[in-house]
Amino acid sequence: MANTVEADGSNDEGYEAAEEGPEDEEDEKREISAIRSYRDVMKLCAAHLPTESDAPNHYQAVCRALFAETMELHTFLAKVKSAKENLKKIQEMEKSDESSTDLEELKNADWARFWVQVMRDLRNGVKLKKVQERQYNPLPIEYQLTPYEMLMDDIRCKRYTLRKVMVNGDIPPRLKKSAHEIILDFIRSRPPLNPVSARKLKPTPPRPRSLHERILEEIKAERKLRPVSPEEIRRSRLDVTTPESTKNLMESSMVNGGLTSQTKENGLSSAEQVPAQRKKLLKAPTLAELDSSESEEETLHKSTSSSSVSPSFPEEPVLEAVSTRKKPPKFLPISSTPQPERRQPPQRRHSIEKETPTNVRQFLPPSRQSSRSLEEFCYPVECLALTVEEVMHIRQVLVKAELEKYQQYKDIYTALKKGKLCFCCRTRRFSFFTWSYTCQFCKRPVCSQCCKKMRLPSKPYSTLPIFSLGPSALQRGESSMRSEKPSTAHHRPLRSIARFSSKSKSMDKSDEELQFPKELMEDWSTMEVCVDCKKFISEIISSSRRSLVLANKRARLKRKTQSFYMSPPGPSEYCPSERTISEI
């Protein structure tokens, strides 16, 4: 507590005064009883202060503070009183419903003015002062502070002197160090810790690999492939054999004189049994494998057929060759499916049609197994025709490849790519007034002259055969087939073959005139197809039909020649041959 030694020897207000107890109280009672005038009161009040000269200023400040507090209390009570009166008036207004007259009186009232100010402040927003903007005066003016505030100000500014406190007749020692330093000393007094380098930690357990890391390792690891010799690869590519190819090999071996008649008979019987025994499913090869196998087959046929002269046939267009390369993804046994033409029909046709009576005489009566395979081969399953979806995919790939040819001509390439130029004629440009037609097959814009109408189903395309779209294309294929027949007639020296040609023609017509049922074509609608796509479809249909017809002809021809040179049955061994109704 702030305490200074008084000059007049008056009692102190500190702890010693509290310890003196009843003696001080008795002295105060005597002094109070001795007060008889205002001067005695002033002297008594001045004795409470450390210096008597500050008494007038101090008590004037106290009086001012008390007066200010009383005035504030008076104004507050007046406002409360006026607010109560106004509230009573409002209640009376609600009762009397005379709001129009009372509102004019309330305009001049204080509470209405204050309410307007409050609403204005709420609308505009009240700006609060920051703490830094407040200027705190450490030495305020005396008359602005109350005695309690003045005392707290003295304590904050440390304007006081403390008494010496004695403990057991001696001054207690001060704390030499702070609590933080004591804690640090305690930590240092403990035994030292081992350095990190000297510690031996346990090995970290292996972290399990995540799924992403395992997938990446499998991708980076090389696949272990089974070693395959090149002979097996060649054998798997060139393993597709027909009875005609085995017969050609037998004929070439007979011309060279390397085999006897006994080995020839055994070879023929084994060659005829191969189609019946080897019945496995073939997967559709990719375009790269087809190209590689085609190049190998062409080199092989060039080496084997060096002595024979192939007849002259007109070359088929490029689109037909590409379309015939792509096989349908349907799996058929080799014995029951004739292989489609792949730039080899002239050689096959030549090998069949160039037969001589000397070669035919070497045939032996076929066994039951070989005759059954011949019957299956004579009437193969009509699976050579591609589906509509496959043809659409082939056509779109060809159109995309055809578009890449025009990359060197930037104007034409950009016009074709953006659909501003006809894709067929490449002369007609499209504008705002001349619209384009979109081909439903190749999905390319074409002009009205290059657009044709064609009946197409809505969907699905995956199971629908391609020959169902265009019977007219089939008729064109038949006419082209008939035009090719006279050119190959002089290659058939056998009269027996010519004798059975009339029957085969009638049967071929019945096979070729197969059309899609009209009941299933009722819901088909006419759609726009470009000229190139229509020609492409007709060529695919004609080529597939042509290969099917040729396969049927070869099978029937071989069966007829074998039955012709077989020994005639006796009267007891007579057995009627099994023939279909169409043959009869």
From Swiss-Prot:
Low complexity composition-biased segments: 302-320
Superkingdom of the source species: Eukaryota
Listed PROSITE patterns: KIND
Keyword terms, alphabetized: Actin-binding, Cell membrane, Coiled coil, Cytoplasm, Cytoplasmic vesicle, Cytoskeleton, Membrane, Phosphoprotein, Protein transport, Repeat, Transport
Region Spir-box, annotated ranges: 384-404
GO cellular component: cell cortex; cleavage furrow; cytoplasmic vesicle membrane; cytoskeleton; cytosol; perinuclear region of cytoplasm
Phosphothreonine found at: T337
Keyword Protein transport applies: yes
Stated family: Belongs to the spire family.
Comment text on domains: Binds to actin monomers via the WH2 domain.
Protein name: Protein spire homolog 1
Name of the gene encoding the protein in the UniProt record: SPIRE1
